[in-house]
Amino acid sequence: NLDQSLAEQRNARYLHMIEIYKHAGFEPYLSYAESIDDIKLSLNNHLPDLVLCGIDHLPENGCNISHNVHAWFEEHNVNYIGSDYKVIELALSKGLLKQKWQTYGIRTPVFGLIREKPEECNEDIESLLSLNAFPYILKPENLGNSRGIDENSIVWNEAELRKALDKMRLQFGGVILAEHYLGASADFREITCAMIEGSSGMLFMPAEVSLVEPKRFHIITTRDKDKNGTIANPLDADTAASFLPFAERVFAIAGVRDYSRGDFILADGEFWAIEINGQPMIPDQWFGSAALFAGLSEEKYLVGIVASGYRRLKAEGRLAQV
C-alpha cells in the first residue's frame, strides 16, 4: 500500500527529527493532529514553549469551520515558529500572491484565474484566450506542493484547456489557476530556494531541481516527490549570483519570516517567481538538500529553523529566557 508506505516513511523522518532536537538540548515531543481539538489536547498535555506546525488549516470537531492554525495560535497566545496567518493565506492563494508580485514588478508567468460558476468560467476562459499565452499549465488555485497537477495539466489549445479544466473541477472544485507554461523553453531550469532567517537577516539557499527520469515536458508532480523521482543539485556560482537578488525581493514581498521555501524557474534568459511555500512540512527533501549545498547539515538547518522563531519571539518579549 503506497499510502501506508509513505506514512511510515514520514513518521520515521519525524522521529529522526525529534532525536536531532533532543541531541541539540531541546525537550521535544511529536504530536499528530487531525483537528483543532487534537491541538488543544496536545497543548494542554505538554504546555510547550514553542510550536512548529506543518499544517496550515484544521477543522473543529462538530463545526463546519476550518481554522488557519497560525491564526488560532495567535488567538490563544501560543508561541509558534513561521509566518503569520495573513502571509500563510497569501502564500496559499497562488493568484493573490502573483498579483502582489506583479504590483511590485516581480516577473511571474502570465496567468488568469478561472472561477467556478458557468457564466464566470466562460468569461475567464475568453480572457485567457485573448491573452494568447499558450501553452498553459492548470493548477488548483489554493493547493501547494504540486498537488493536483500532472502531465495532462499542460494544455496547448482551447479544446485541451476545456477538457483539462473539466477534469480538475470534478476532482478539486474551486478556482483554477492557468499560467503560461515555461517548460517548453530551450533553457528551462527549475530552482527551489530554502530560506532561514538568521541573526543577521535571511539566508537564501538555492538548488536546481530535476527529474530522475526526464519527461517530454518538465513537470514535477506530488507522485514524483513522494517516490523520490526528483534530484536536487547545487546551483552553479554564476547563476546563483544572478538569482539571489531576485529571490530576496520575491521572499520580502511575500512577507514570510523564520523559514520558507520558494519555487522559481529560469527560462528565456530570465528568472520567474512561481510560488512560495510559507509553511514547509519539515523535514523536507528539497529544503534539506538546499541547506546542505549552503554548508548546513541536517541538524544545523533544523535547529536553525527553531532558533529563528525563538529569536523573533524573544525580541517581541514573548519569551523570557533561554
PLM feature segments, named:
Residues N1, D56-E60, E141-L143:
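Short glycine-rich anion-binding loops that position phosphate/pyrophosphate groups of nucleotides
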Residues N1-Y14:
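Glycine- and acidic-residue-enriched helix-capping/strand-helix junction motifs
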Residues N11-E116:
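Conserved N-proximal alpha/beta basic substrate-recognition cap immediately N-terminal to
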Residues N44, I88-R189, A241:
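Active-site nucleotide/adenylate-binding loops and adjacent lid/helix of ATP-dependent enzymes
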Residues E158-D238, P245, D268-W272:
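Phosphate-binding site of ATP-dependent enzymes
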Residues D236-V322:
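ATP-dependent carboxylate activation and anion-phosphoryl transfer catalytic cores
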